[in-house]
């Protein structure tokens, strides 16, 4: 499994703490040697260490998509064995994808079904949106 970290807070502007989110992410280097990334906004910071298994170039995390009410971001660790079926279902509902990664499928699934996306996933995983 990959390594994920998160920080949600409303008492600080977390953008001012970007270096701390990057340090938190760096502590998990052993969980994913292939890539790392951070996403920091006013009230949320996510970090991810990646062991690339699928879509080596397109599956960078944290991943975000713009919505009318602001960006929605995800960090995801795991394997969803049915992500291709879910992707086809979501495409049929009008979602478009930029990568072949399971992470993007989970993110779009969250946008479509909310937290109930977890009930549709077949596999082992952890994620934060």
PLM features: what roles do these ranges have?
Residues 1-129:
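N-terminus-centric sequence/structural signature that marks the extreme N-terminus
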């Amino acid at each position: 499994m990959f390594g994920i970290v998160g920080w949600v807070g409303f008492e600080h502007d977390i953008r001012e703490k970007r270096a701390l989110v990057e340090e938190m992410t760096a502590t998990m280097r052993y969980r994913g040697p292939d890539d790392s990334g951070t996403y920091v906004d006013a009230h949320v910071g996510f970090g991810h260490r990646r062991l690339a298994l699928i879509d080596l170039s397109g599956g960078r995390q944290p991943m975000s998509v713009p919505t009318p009410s602001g960006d929605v971001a995800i960090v995801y660790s795991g394997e969803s064995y049915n992500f291709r079926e879910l992707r086809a279902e979501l495409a049929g509902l009008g979602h478009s994808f930029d990568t072949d990664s399971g992470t993007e499928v989970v993110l779009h699934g969250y946008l479509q079904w909310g937290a109930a996306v977890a009930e549709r996933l077949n596999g082992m995983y952890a994620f934060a949106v």
